[in-house]
């Protein structure tokens, strides 16, 4: 792979006026996601059995069993957007303390905040098959 695609001359990313969640909106919407949508866990991990209290509560809220609740992540949610251009927009939002150790960042299109792929909330919906 010794050939690279050339970027169009003058491409400097997105204009600042391109509409996207602001840092202030993100902070507010994150707090709403935690309080009203059970967004978590606070310290995500891939360790089986970790964060039991969180996943038992999520399972009850989502009317599924704990095992199914653990399979749900922002990264496999219908509303998770981590496309290239969204990543460019996300770079405008500084990393928050809660972003560290929580996986990659994406944009939750339903709750309009920067979420992390290792977390989940009650708004989670199964992603539609891309084969459809």
What residue ranges belong to the model's regions?
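Cysteine-centered metal-binding/redox modules
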Residues: 2-132
């Amino acid at each position: 792979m010794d050939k690279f695609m050339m970027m169009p001359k003058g491409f400097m990313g997105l204009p600042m006026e391109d509409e996207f969640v602001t840092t202030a909106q993100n902070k507010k919407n994150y707090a709403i996601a935690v309080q009203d949508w059970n967004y978590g866990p606070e310290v995500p991990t891939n360790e089986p059995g970790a964060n039991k209290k969180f996943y038992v509560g999520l399972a009850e809220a989502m009317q599924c069993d704990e095992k199914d609740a653990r399979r749900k992540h922002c990264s496999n949610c219908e509303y998770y957007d981590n496309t290239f251009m969204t990543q460019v927009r996300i770079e405008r939002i500084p990393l928050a303390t809660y972003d560290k150790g929580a996986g990659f960042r994406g944009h939750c299109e339903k709750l309009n905040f920067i979420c992390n792929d290792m977390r989940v909330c009650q708004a989670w919906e199964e992603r539609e098959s891309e084969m459809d």
